[in-house]
Amino acid sequence: MIINTIDKIYNPKNIEESIYNFWEKSNYFEPDIINNYKKNYCIMMPPPNITGGLHLGHAFQQTIMDILVRYQRMNGKNVLWASGLDHAGIATQILIEKNFYNKKNSIKDNHDPHSLIKEVWLWKEKSEKFINYQIKRLGHSVSWKNKHFTMDPEISLAVKEAFIQLYTNNLIYKGKQLVNWDSKLQTAISDLEVSHKQKSDFIWYIQYQLEYNTSHINNQKKNADYLTIATTRPETILGDVAIAVNPEDPRYSHLIGKYVFTPITNRRIPIISDKFVNINKGTGCVKITPAHDFNDYIIGKKYKLPMINIFSTYKTILTIPEISNNQGQPYIQSNDQYHIPKMFHNLDYKDARKKIIEECKRLKILEDIKTHQLTVPINNRTGTIIEPMLTDQWFIKTKFLAKQAINAVTNEKIKFIPKNYTNIYLQWMNEIQDWCISRQIWWGHRIPVWYDNNNTIYVGHCEKDIRIKNQLNKDIQLSQDNNVLDTWFSSSLWTFSSLGWPKNNTLLKMFHPTNIIISGFDIIFFWIARMIMMTMYLVKDQNNNAQIPFKKIYITGLMRDKFGQKMSKSKGNGIDPIDIIDGISKKKLLKKQLKENSQSKSISSIIKYINTQFPNGIKPYGADTLRLTLTALASSGQDIHWDMHKLESYHNFCNKLWNVSKFVITHTDNYHYDIDTKNKKIFSLSDRWITSKLHQTIQKFSQALNDYRFDHTVNILYEFIWHQFCDWYIEFTKPILYHSTNTLQLISTRYTLITSLESILRLSHPIIPFITEKIWQKIHSIVTTNNKHTIMLQSFPKYDSNYIDLESISDIEWIQNLIAEIRMIRTYTGISYKIPLDIGFYNTSNHIKECISENYHILTKILQLQTINFLEKNDISNNRYFKIPIKESELIIFIPNIFDKKTAIHKFNKEIKLINYKIHLLEQKMNNTNYSLNLQHSFKKSQEKLNHYNKTKNKLLNQYFIVKNL
């Protein structure tokens, strides 16, 4: 029996941490590796970066994962939810530089990377501790015995093995290609780290001299011996190799195949044609600089043009340009024609631009200058303008790998949720380019490549293995490649490397492929696609068939604030989940945000945001409220617009569940339930009804969860718990609990109360685990006989059609309508609940008579009725009554003598005026032609709403005239 009741006030702070400690110490989160007789279920948590703590976006995705693993665990699956951390190469290196060293100087030039790596590991330990704390406070049931860091030795082994296998099979190569180059970090970066910002600048119109005068051709104007090029980057003139025009442009078709001379350097370059040139943009002539523009690079490779790199890695002009052919190999021809005038040597690109413009003016070939809006590529971490740069890098050949990855999705071995992301994925995969996997930084996985003095490449796990394998003498010196691998390389191996690959161990056999991955749409290409490619190439099943990394991909939107702005620390609108769970004062919140953004240029806007959005700080809501709110916002694939006010609503829901549980415990504690539960006759109408609604709810909830409509699950729970269980069923039980002397009725009602609550707790547990565990611990001894001491290991409620009693559902619906009509009359007429009413029924079916008679006691108590009578036509002798048609009967509500006619007329007028206004607005909306034509579904719903309004209006008018004529 229950020993203690639950606390009077719901205070999540008093229960959540102790409950999590109980779960963790009891090893409830850990899978069964030894006695594996269950079906396995596995999710790999996308590893958060060690650069900082979790934000609401992490909390959202992890909550979705936790709901799934708790649901599957309760459905009897052997669950592994593995977690971990990502070393986040570039992001972490920038953080360490910012925190520990002079921001103006490159860390590589002034400090020993080995000493800095120690600092990174210290940071990692600190970050890991805080992130794990956040995960625990959110209630996430991860396997703490199966957590990994992407720089752990076992992960490092997998990374090396993957590289070696790909290289051995000619899928990794080293070559000179165009990449995003950060001149501050001195490294290539991925497209994901590049943002594009609009900037107001200039566009310069510069003349290129034609090789010979063509003014006599096609009636060209006299002296038209040049082409005018519009460019936003005049400094790259030094690297021009061609001029491109559209073959369908009549202005220039006669010049295709001819030549021009580049300004200042006077190099002879061809005029080529390609349909990529926009006839209507600029002058219709495009300068081609393959070494410093991605579009030009494609054209350069297509037409086998030389590539002239004019910049050093620091974006200063080289004294001697680096010339390559379209394959990235050194250009054989004489370099004399590719000289760079001395006046530009070693100039910063901005100074070189000024100098070029000055020279063009001096040579009188600068035709015009106009203001121009252009898009500038920026490293979103450093703010550095990115330069397309030809550099020697390591690449993976992706087209071969992509074929299997495409087939896995088209054949539905892997399914996207929602489905529309399938086409986005396939479009990108069909246009995939080779993947640059090398980075010129010190933090990350060193590329497992060594060179001898002749630059011969050796690939292996370590130098010792290489020497043994290649039988190299000790005299031969080897040096390891200084580059590290792109962070996404190790991340792409995550599902299997964290399960022990390349060793074919137990975890890998049991839990791979994993069941589902939860990810944001912004990294489909950078992570999801690469995981599929790498897994299918490297991991085989027992029949040597390619394994997929996961069976389903659930894509989430971005976390935005209520104004639609993406949440981020730099904007000051990012929220630490702990601040919602525990609460935080405005003063502390402001201090925290300013500390995290001490170098930001947006200090004033951050202060303004905090002052307006959190004038009183954030009150403590607890993890369950946060989880419930996040789940309610999980509309499939849509961005999440966070609004603090929604928390209040769901906190009230948790409070409601707590209070109704107190009520149930109070009325069911220390009672015996020795009854035949299969005998429906011993249960009241309301008992049979709530049991039916419970099983309908279980069915809908399970279906929504299986369809990954997490937002629907919250709506389903809210509707049942708040409206059906609390608002209706609890009210139906009170007359029985407080006034009934029927022992069997009391027992059956108490039994239905406690068993319904227990089912509600199990149903809700995956979303709100703490409050459900706490309450369940207080009641489980009454309703469970198994020896599992936690709700998380109880079975999830199962839908059983045998419990659906359609007649009871129909009868309670009739009673609810009856109650609503009588309460409405009290509201409109101002008749106090202290005044008991007399009601009667005309033309009533026998079934309804039985229903009323069976529930007579309940109805009189709930509605404060004095009498309920079944009437004949001659039973009414005056006009002091309202007659309201309801199903299978007519309701008569007698108007008592104590009645304020004036107040009633005023209220009726007010309600009639309001309903007329609603009708007017809706009719205006529906009379809009575009609305009726374009939104047929909405129009139909509006028509239904209008019919309801008119019906309500007629009822009000009828009742109004009855009162008026009294």
Curated annotation (Swiss-Prot):
Enzyme class, spelled out: ligase
Keyword Nucleotide-binding applies: yes
Subcellular location: Cytoplasm
Entry keyword set: Aminoacyl-tRNA synthetase, ATP-binding, Coiled coil, Cytoplasm, Ligase, Nucleotide-binding, Protein biosynthesis
Catalytic activity: tRNA(Val) + L-valine + ATP = L-valyl-tRNA(Val) + AMP + diphosphate
Residues that hold ATP according to the record: 569
Signal peptide from the UniProt entry: none
Molecular function as annotated in GO: aminoacyl-tRNA deacylase activity; ATP binding; valine-tRNA ligase activity
Main location: cytoplasm
Motif ('KMSKS' region): 566-570
Enzyme Commission (EC) number: 6.1.1.9
Any single GO BP term: valyl-tRNA aminoacylation
Pfam families on file: Anticodon_1, tRNA-synt_1
Domain notes: ValRS has two distinct active sites: one for aminoacylation and one for editing. The misactivated threonine is translocated from the active site to the editing site. The C-terminal coiled-coil domain is crucial for aminoacylation activity.
Function field: Catalyzes the attachment of valine to tRNA(Val). As ValRS can inadvertently accommodate and process structurally similar amino acids such as threonine, to avoid such errors, it has a 'posttransfer' editing activity that hydrolyzes mischarged Thr-tRNA(Val) in a tRNA-dependent manner.
Similarity field: Belongs to the class-I aminoacyl-tRNA synthetase family. ValS type 1 subfamily.
Subunit record text: Monomer.
Protein name, as recorded: Valine--tRNA ligase
Lineage of origin: Bacteria, Pseudomonadati, Pseudomonadota, Gammaproteobacteria, Enterobacterales
